[in-house]
Swiss-Prot record:
GO biological process entries: lysine biosynthetic process via aminoadipic acid; mitochondrial genome maintenance; tricarboxylic acid cycle
Native source organism of the sequence: Emericella nidulans (strain FGSC A4 / ATCC 38163 / CBS 112.46 / NRRL 194 / M139)
Cofactor remark from the record: Binds 1 [4Fe-4S] cluster per subunit.
Lineage: Eukaryota, Fungi, Dikarya, Ascomycota, Pezizomycotina
GO molecular function: 4 iron, 4 sulfur cluster binding; aconitate hydratase activity; double-stranded DNA binding; metal ion binding; mRNA binding; single-stranded DNA binding
Region (Disordered): 524-555
SUPFAM superfamilies for the chain: Aconitase iron-sulfur domain, LeuD/IlvD-like
Protein name stated in the entry: Aconitate hydratase, mitochondrial
Tagged with keyword Transit peptide: yes
Gene: acoA
Main enzyme class: lyase
Record keyword Lipid metabolism present: no
Amino acid sequence: MITTRLARMGALAPKSRLLFGTRGMATVADLDKKVEMCNLEKGNYINYKKMSENLDVVRRRLTRPLTYAEKILYSHLDDPQNQDIERGKSYLKLRPDRVACQDATAQMAILQFMSAGMPSVATPTTVHCDHLIEAQLGGEKDLARANEINKEVYDFLASSTAKYNIGFWKPGSGIIHQIILENYAFPGGLMIGTDSHTPNAGGLAIAAIGVGGADAVDVMAGLPWELKAPKVIGVRLTGEMSGWTAPKDIILKVAGLLTVKGGTGAIIEYHGPGVNSLSATGMATICNMGAEIGATTSLFPFNDRMYDYLKATKRQQIGDFARSYAKDLREDEGAEYDQLIEINLSELEPHINGPFTPDLATPISQFKEAVKANGWPEELKVGLIGSCTNSSYEDMSRAASIAQDALDHGLKAKSIFTVTPGSEQIRATIERDGQLKTLEEFGGVILANACGPCIGQWDRKDVKKGTPNSIVSSYNRNFTGRNDANPATHAFVTSPDLVVALSIAGTLNFNPLTDTLKDKDGKEFKLKAPTGDGLPSRGYDPGRDTYQAPPTDRSSVDVAVSPSSDRLQLLAGFQPWDGKDATGIPILIKCQGKTTTDHISMAGPWLKYRGHLDNISNNMLIGAVNAENGEANKIKNVFTGEYGAVPATARDYKARGVKWVVIGDWNYGEGSSREHAALEPRHLGGLAIITRSFARIHETNLKKQGMLPLTFSDPADYDRIPPDATVDLLCTELAVDKPMTLRVHPKDGASFDVKLSHTFNESQIEWFKDGSALNTMARKSGN
C-alpha cells in the first residue's frame, strides 16, 4: 500500500521497539565518552554530544516529532540556531563526519583538491581501488593485470593520499561500500561518498549520501556541505521473510512502486516491526539500491542486528556508545512522512527486475509469462552474484547452500556463473568456511574483489556484440549495455538466491518455488529453500592487509603527474561568466528518452581516462539518442552541415568560440554520481542543459562546474523545440526563484519564448558567475 498524504507514524502503528530496549535520556557523561569512529584512525571521534545538543536546538525551534532521517541531518547542521528548515525547500548547510571516494572518481576529486592549495584534508577521507579492475580470467590474474595497466593511476592515488592525510585501500581490498560497512559506518553519522551507491552504509543507521567530486572537495577542505532538505518517504515493514524471499526483494518491490524517479529529492526511511528480522547486511542491500529510485539516501533505525554486526567487525565499543544514544537513533513517536509505503514481508514474493531498467518489477510467479509476452531471450547465458549490493557473508552462504543442493543431485550451473566477493575480508572468510569451494565446484569463476561486470568492467567473450541474450545478476543497475557494452543484452537484477537457481536451470523459465529439476539420474527434485548464517560463527578472517595508512610525516611525499600522461591531467580553472545573455547559440543535441550518466559519460573502457578531463571528454553523450534521427552519437554540425560524433562537434563549436546547450528528457542524469558527466560538457564549451527533469546528483554536479541545469516550466515545451533551432538564453535573468527565458529560433517559422525553471540559490548563482564552485572557493580563500 502507498499513502501519499502526510503520514503520522505513531497514529498508524505501534512503534517497533529496539530489541535491547530504549533507554531514557542519555546523561552528559554517557555522551562525553571518547569513542573513535573506526579502528584504523586515531583522534577522529564520534560526537554524539554535539549531535544531541544540535537536536535540542532544532526541537525547540520546530516543536514537532522528527523522522530518523531528519535527526541525522539536523544533528549535523553547521548553524542549527539560524538554519532555515523546511523539507523539500530549504538548503541545509551540513558538516559530514566522513568522505569516501572510489578510484575512478577519486582522481578528479584529488586533482580538484590539489588546486585548492591545502596541506591536508580537514575531514576524515578514504580512497578505495575497486573500479579499474576488468573481469577477464579470474581474480588473481585480473588483479595482476589491473596493477600493471593502472600503475600510473594507482601510484598517483597512493602518493596523493599519503600527501594529504587520506586512508588508501589498495587494489584487491574490495568494493568501497563493503569496506565502508566493515570499517567506517557508525549509527547516527553523516557521510558523503563519490559513488551513487554510498547509501549502502544505511544498513548501519548512518545517512550516507552519494555526491560528485566537487561536493567531496568542499568537505575535504573543511567547508559546510549544502543539501536541499529532502522529503522523507517512510517504508513500514511488517511480518517476516521466509523461504526464497530475500532482503533484495524489498527494494525490488519498492523500485517497482516508486519507479526510477519516485525517490528523487527524498530519503527513504525504513521502520516497523519487520525491520528487526533483517540482518545489518540485508538492510545495507536495501539501502544500496535506493539509488535506483533516485533517493538522496536510505536508512534503517539502529537495532540489535546492527549491534551484532558492529561486534562481529570488532567495533563493539561503537555499538555500546550507540546504545547510550539510542533514543535518537530512530524516529520519534508520531513522526510524519511525506509518503508512506507498507510492505508485509510475510506476503512478499521474490522479484526479478528488468530488463534495461531497475524499476520494471515482476514477481517470480508472473515472470515466465512476462518472458513469453515480451519475447525476452529465454536461455540464460550468464548468472552473476556478488557486487557491492549482495556480497555479504549471508548472501554467499545462502547462495552456496543452493549450489550444494544442486551438487548433491549431480548438477552444476548450466549457465556461465561468476562470483564477485565484496571485500578481501569476505573472500578470506568464505574461503575458510567452505562457501567459496562450493561455488567453484558448482562452476563458478571467482572474480577479483572489485566492481567488475557490475560497472561494465567485463571482457565478455561468450556472445558477439549485437546478439540478443539474457543475463541475471544480483547487482543493482541494469541499464542498456551497462554490464557488457552490448545493447542487445537483456540484463535482469534479482537476489543471489534466484541467480543461482536460474543458473542451474539455464533458463529464465524456471521458478524454484514451484518447478522441479532432473538430477543426474533423471529423477525430478525441487531445490531446497536457501539457508545461511547472517554472521560467521568463527568471526571474520581479515585476509591480506590491503590498507595503507597515511604516514605521520608527510612533508617529503611528492605527487607527480607527468605532463605527457594520457591518464592524468592537472586541471585548469574554468572561465567565469561574461555577464551577458547568450544569443544565437546551437542545440548540440536534443536527447530522446532515457539519458543516464552512462549515456552521458560511459564507464567500462573509458574508466582509465577518469583522471584526464580532455581525453575522457571524447565520450561525452556518445550513448544519447538524437531525437532528430533516432541514432546515437550522430548529430549535425550547424556550421558545416555535416553529421559527426557528439564530442567532435562540440569541440568544433568550442574552437569557433560558440557556446551550446543540450535539450534533455525526463530524469536526465539518472544513475551514478560521476561528475565527469558534468565536467565534460563544461570542458567542451557547454552553457546549459535544459530538460523536463533532472536526477538530483547530476543537477548538483552541473551547478558545481558552472553549468546551468534548467527545466522546462511546462514539460510539454520539450516537444516544441526543433533539434536544428538556434536559441537565446537570457542568463542575465538568473535569480533565486525567478524563471528564465529561452528564445527559440526555428530554422523555419517564427521565433517563440519558453519559460525555464531552476533550483539555484544565492551561493550557487555565485558558482555560475565565478565559473565553478572551485573558483568561488579559491576566490574566497584568496588562492
